[in-house]
């Protein structure tokens, strides 16, 4: 099963709010999810990002592929750097 870490859109029309979720790559954008990893609110200034770092690193280590936007959010939070250090230090 191909697993992705991606954004699931929530919120009302014209006011998006996203959950960062782990989902099967074949499921629809707002469909079934395996686990919620965090949240992202682009409307606040600056944008609010809350990520459970342990869950994110666990799923990355298990082979989940982040979407481009999630990869950028993880990089801003320093999670991708920790993952690469963890992966290549072995």
Swiss-Prot record:
- Molecular functions (GO terms): structural constituent of ribosome
A GO biological process of this protein is: translation
Does the keyword field hold S-adenosyl-L-methionine?
no
Q: Does the keyword Ribosomal protein apply?
A: yes
- One Pfam family, short name: Ribosomal_S16
Q: Which residues form a coiled coil?
A: none
Q: Name the Gene3D superfamilies on file.
A: 3.30.1320.10
Write out the entry's keywords from A to Z.
Ribonucleoprotein, Ribosomal protein
> What are the record's GO terms for cellular component?
cytoplasm; small ribosomal subunit
Query: Which InterPro entries is this protein grouped with?
Result: Ribosomal_bS16 (IPR000307), Ribosomal_bS16_CS (IPR020592), Ribosomal_bS16_dom_sf (IPR023803)
Q: Name the family the entry cites.
A: Belongs to the bacterial ribosomal protein bS16 family.
Q: What is this protein called?
A: Small ribosomal subunit protein bS16
